[in-house]
């Protein structure tokens, strides 16, 4: 039955490119038949860059989102690719939380006019991620460097 969840599930093919143009999108979408060639060109362009920095990763992400290759999960896949590329190029990775979702989406929409919003929200996310890593390092080093007398005292309190 058209318009039902079951109809949607039958149309969505995880891991395969979409074959239709998604409805309710606020931007023009490429045809399903153009997805493979568009992704190939995007990847080739990205991989031939002399240097990959945060801005190039974000531009790749925005263009990936414009291609919108799948029926569902494009944002999750795109953000996972960004995380992987940050690690690959020794850039502090980041996780975009729900609190910043609207700014992230606005930044994608405005990318070719003004890159500030997306770069800013990502820099905030990188800073938070780096702080979390540093906090974990401090906690681990505090556990590692505790004097033996202190550790013994903790054991005695537990008994």
Can you describe what each PLM-predicted range is?
Residues 1-159:
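FIC/Doc superfamily catalytic core
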């Amino acid at each position: 039955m058209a318009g039902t969840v079951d109809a949607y599930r039958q149309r969505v093919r995880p891991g395969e490119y979409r074959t239709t143009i998604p409805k309710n999108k606020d931007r023009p979408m490429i045809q399903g038949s153009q997805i493979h060639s568009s992704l190939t060109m995007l990847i080739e362009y990205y991989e031939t860059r002399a240097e990959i920095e945060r801005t190039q990763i974000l531009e790749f992400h925005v263009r990936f989102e414009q291609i919108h290759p799948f029926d569902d999960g494009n944002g999750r896949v795109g953000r996972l690719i960004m995380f992987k590329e940050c690690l690959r190029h020794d850039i502090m990775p980041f996780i975009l939380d729900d609190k910043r979702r609207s700014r992230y989406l606005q930044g994608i929409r405005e990318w070719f006019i003004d890159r500030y919003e997306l770069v800013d929200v990502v820099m905030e996310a990188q800073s938070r991620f780096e702080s979390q890593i540093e906090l974990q390092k401090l906690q681990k080093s505090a556990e590692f460097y505790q004097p033996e007398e202190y550790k013994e005292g903790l054991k005695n309190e537990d008994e």
